[in-house]
Amino acid sequence: MNQRKPANNSLIDNCLTLTGIVTSIVKQSQSPLGIPNYSFWLEHRSNKMEVNLERQVWCKIQVILNGCQFSLITQQIKLGDKVKISGFIHTHKDYNGLSKLVLHTEQIEFIDQEKPNGTLFPSS
């Protein structure tokens, strides 16, 4: 039987940039290793052309921010804020064992807002 070899992970790209409205308050927790974890829900709505037809696009995704570098940024995130998130997608299992797609944040930018420092990136 001919088996397929797994793809080389260095050739697989996983990046997503999504702009939307914050629809929940930021929740904070801590990993067993003591790493701060933050999360909130982002709702995206737009119109896109597909096969010469305009399509209304909508999605709601949980945004995850892991690490101390996000502690100040998350204090500024409020319900209704428009943000641009760049990061990677990953599957999380909830308490019922159901899988859901989440967006792990690498960069966050406030859009059309009077926020200090404009674009906010995690510090290295």
UniProtKB/Swiss-Prot annotation:
Pfam families, sorted: SSB_1
Entry keyword annotation includes ATP-binding: no
PROSITE patterns for this protein: SSB
InterPro entries in the record: NA-bd_OB-fold, Primosome_PriB/ssb, Prisomal_replication_PriB
One MF annotation (Gene Ontology) recorded for this entry: single-stranded DNA binding
Domain of life the protein comes from: Bacteria
GO biological process: DNA replication, synthesis of primer
Listed GO CC annotations: primosome complex
Residues in SSB domain copies: 12-112
Keywords: DNA replication, DNA-binding, Primosome
UniProt family annotation: Belongs to the PriB family.
Record function comment: Involved in the restart of stalled replication forks, which reloads the replicative helicase on sites other than the origin of replication; the PriA-PriB pathway is the major replication restart pathway. During primosome assembly it facilitates complex formation between PriA and DnaT on DNA; stabilizes PriA on DNA. Stimulates the DNA unwinding activity of PriA helicase.
Subunit description: Homodimer. Interacts with PriA and DnaT. Component of the replication restart primosome. Primosome assembly occurs via a 'hand-off' mechanism. PriA binds to replication forks, subsequently PriB then DnaT bind; DnaT then displaces ssDNA to generate the helicase loading substrate.
Protein name: Replication restart protein PriB
UniProt lineage: Bacteria, Pseudomonadati, Pseudomonadota, Gammaproteobacteria, Pasteurellales
